Swiss-Prot record:
Function of the protein: Might be related to the phospholipid scramblase and tubby-like superfamily of membrane tethered transcription factors.
Family note: Belongs to the LOR family.
Listed PANTHER family: PROTEIN LURP-ONE-RELATED 10 (PTHR31087:SF155), PTHR31087
A Pfam match: LOR
Protein name: Protein LURP-one-related 10
Record-linked InterPro entries: LOR, LOR_sf, Tubby-like_C
Domain of life: Eukaryota
Organism: Arabidopsis thaliana (Mouse-ear cress)
Length: 194
């Protein structure tokens, strides 16, 4: 199921490593690698900006997605667009909390751009902020499309990085899944600051 592009789908499971750098000025806040350590994506987040926008770039700095938080929403609504665009015509999906009040176990709904009524989600995410893990499901079903777990290492604690391991199931768009993980991490950081 290609959400971003068929180029980001494989007929076999994909294992990704995601590292969130706590303090960085140059190379982005996230690095996403394959099992061999090859860089696939990175995320640029403006260091000093009033814009709540992140850009998912490929290994060659080509913009793949723009992730924009809608600050006027009560449901932590995020809008995700193709490339560097924020035009409605380039909207790929909207992510929002299933309900306004959620403690420690968030439930998020994802609506693809063609799902204008947003009554039944196209994907949903359940997770545990304590365990820093989540599962992405297709629609309102129990069909898993991806899973994420936080990896704790002594090195990651000492050098200010958070490491995540992600399994993306066959034929699922891994750029889409990476964008969800970036948004989930941001929501988690905002919740822990409140």
């Amino acid at each position: 199921m290609a959400i971003v592009s068929p180029n980001f789908c494989a007929p076999y499971p994909i294992e990704l490593g995601i590292v969130r750098k706590v303090m960085t000025l140059t190379d982005g806040n996230f690095a996403v690698t394959d099992v061999n350590g090859n860089l696939l994506f990175k995320v640029k987040e403006p260091l000093f900006s009033i814009s709540d926008k992140r850009i998912l770039l490929d290994a060659y700095d080509t913009p793949i997605l723009t992730l924009r938080e809608n600050k006027v929403s009560l449901h932590d609504r995020w809008l995700v667009y193709r490339g560097k665009s924020t035009d409605q015509s380039d909207l790929l999906y909207t992510l929002k909390r299933s309900s306004m009040i959620q403690i420690m176990k968030p439930k998020l709904d994802i609506f693809l751009a063609h799902n204008k009524e947003m009554k039944i989600c196209d994907f949903h995410v359940k997770g545990s902020w304590i365990d820093r893990s989540c599962v992405v499901y297709a629609g309102k079903s129990d069909a898993i499309v991806a899973q994420m777990h936080k990896k704790h290492t002594a090195q990651s604690i000492l050098i200010g990085k958070s490491n995540f391991s992600v399994t993306v199931y066959p034929n699922v768009d891994f750029a889409f899944i990476v964008s969800l993980i970036v948004i989930l991490d941001d929501i988690n950081r905002e919740d822990s600051e409140d």
